[in-house]
Amino acid sequence: MAKKALVNKANKKPKFAVRAYTRCQRCGRPHSVFRKFGLCRICVREMAHAGELPGVHKSSW
């Protein structure tokens, strides 16, 4: 889990737009965040396996 101070810092509007970055809404992870879901890859995988993301299923070939 991310520190609360870092999550609060990410939620504030930065002085310059290029400084803004996405964080996972569930765990606060700053890297590998899917914009479509607002979640990191780890949370997307866990929630997809649990069936908590509608329209998403595990592919196999």
From Swiss-Prot:
Ribonucleoprotein in keyword set: yes
Gene Ontology cellular-component terms listed: cytoplasm; small ribosomal subunit
Pfam short name (any one): Ribosomal_S14
PROSITE patterns xrefs: RIBOSOMAL_S14 (PS00527)
Quaternary organization: Part of the 30S ribosomal subunit. Contacts proteins S3 and S10.
Organism of this sequence: Rhodococcus opacus (strain B4)
UniProtKB keywords: Metal-binding, Ribonucleoprotein, Ribosomal protein, RNA-binding, rRNA-binding, Zinc
Identification of the protein by name: Small ribosomal subunit protein uS14
Key word rRNA-binding present: yes
InterPro entries listed in its UniProt record: Ribosomal_uS14, Ribosomal_uS14_bact, Ribosomal_uS14_CS, Ribosomal_uS14_sf
Named cofactor requirement(s): Zn(2+)
